[in-house]
Swiss-Prot record:
Source species of the chain: Burkholderia ambifaria (strain ATCC BAA-244 / DSM 16087 / CCUG 44356 / LMG 19182 / AMMD) (Burkholderia cepacia (strain AMMD))
GO CC terms of this entry: large ribosomal subunit
Name of this chain's protein: Large ribosomal subunit protein bL32
Family that this chain belongs to: Belongs to the bacterial ribosomal protein bL32 family.
SUPFAM superfamilies: Zn-binding ribosomal proteins
Gene: rpmF
Biased composition annotated in UniProt, kind: Basic residues: 49-59
NCBIfam families: rpmF_bact
Amino acid sequence: MAVQQNKKSPSKRGMHRSHDFLTATPLAVEPSTGEVHLRHHVSPNGYYRGKKVVKTKND
């Protein structure tokens, strides 16, 4: 099992943890309907990049 040789200072510990924060997922707006969805995913009403690609129950 790995064991550290020297104690890491609070400054170095903070630098190590500086990239561990969570980021918000980027959202996209569907140009034809104005609906918000995850990027590179089909919107809930079946549109992707302005075109109808999936049939929904209402169609």
